[in-house]
Amino acid sequence: MELPKLLISLFLFSFSSFFLGAESDYPQHSNLKRLRPNRLFVFGDSYADTGNIRKSLSDSWKIPYGITFPQKPSGRFSDGRVATDFLARYLGIKSPIPYTWKDYAGKERLLYGMNYAYGGTGVFKTKDNPLPNMTTQIDYFQRVLAAGNIYSPSDLPSSLALVSVAGNDYATFLALKRPLTELPAFMKQVVDQIAVNAMRIHKLGVNKIVIPSMQPLGCLPSITVFNSFQRCNATDNASTNLHNYLLHKAIARLNNETKPSTFVVLDHYNAFLTVFKNKGPEPGVSRFGNPLKPCCVGVNSSYDCSNVDEKGEKKYIICEDPKAAFFWDIFHPSEEGWRSVYSVLHKHLKAIWI
């Protein structure tokens, strides 16, 4: 997720009263087959992108991104693996090949699925970003299916789709200086479009679609930098919760309309908070000294992770051990951060599976 720095003034309203009972609106289906999918299709933004953006257009292809895995930049917005990789690992499959690299991958590699996510994008067009939004990403998926030379209709029922929406639409809302009084209505538009996208993916043949809730935006280092990375912004998190409440409602409606297909909200929000608050031996979850402080930052507010000056000299600082940091840069978790989040989510994944 590439939120602009003006995200610091994110949201002014608290909608806490709307959040009660959100989980109860999520229907449970008792007739689900307990079989894990064998291929993964991915749509969304930089929390899921594994290398779709051209190298000339993205910091994710610059040093020090990829320093942990694969020890060089790979187009991932992290020092290593991201959400897509850990979900694929849970499924027991290789991480799906990025769409833009499909012509360079062998047929066997493509059978694990395909990743259509592009960093910095949203469900709608995002500001100053020519990359494909989610509707266009699904268009690409539909074209691949129509070609018929990689996937057959019989492949799709045993597939899973991951739909990542981490906040770029709201960053664009703020960048365009729209009145904050319009924000709740815009949130509903975003969530309604997520539901439209998820249903479209289902109608193309995918029977299981996972949509992560939005991570606590008020805990991003781009926000917490203003209190020396000491605490999350409660107002921003309350507004994030409105998005998540609306998402649960929308997904509940889809589940009521499309049995036995299941749309699942994967609880990134509370998984992030669980990791932040971990003070003891939570199985598989790292204990971070200060989880809000990122590993890689610019030397000052004019620079970001990976920036160099006109002489090629580094204008960023990296922490001594990326594994000791939950966040890699001011927006994105580190590999160890993502690993801890998906360790928390392991029980949830096991409970909803398939």
Curated annotation (Swiss-Prot):
The keyword Protease does not apply. CDD domains: SGNH_plant_lipase_like. It is found in: Secreted. Residues 1-24 form the signal peptide. GO terms for cellular component: extracellular region. Keywords: Glycoprotein, Hydrolase, Lipid degradation, Lipid metabolism, Secreted, Signal. Disulfide bonds: none annotated. The active site is at 46 (nucleophile), 329, 332. One of its GO terms (biological process) is lipid catabolic process. It comes from the Eukaryota. Glycans are attached at residues 133, 233, 237, 256, 300. It is an enzyme of class 3 (hydrolase). One of its GO terms (molecular function) is hydrolase activity, acting on ester bonds. It holds the Pfam family Lipase_GDSL. Its EC number is 3.1.1.-. Its main location: secreted. The keyword Hydrolase applies. Belongs to the 'GDSL' lipolytic enzyme family. PANTHER family: BNAANNG22470D PROTEIN, OSJNBB0059K02.9 PROTEIN. This is GDSL esterase/lipase At3g09930. It comes from Arabidopsis thaliana.
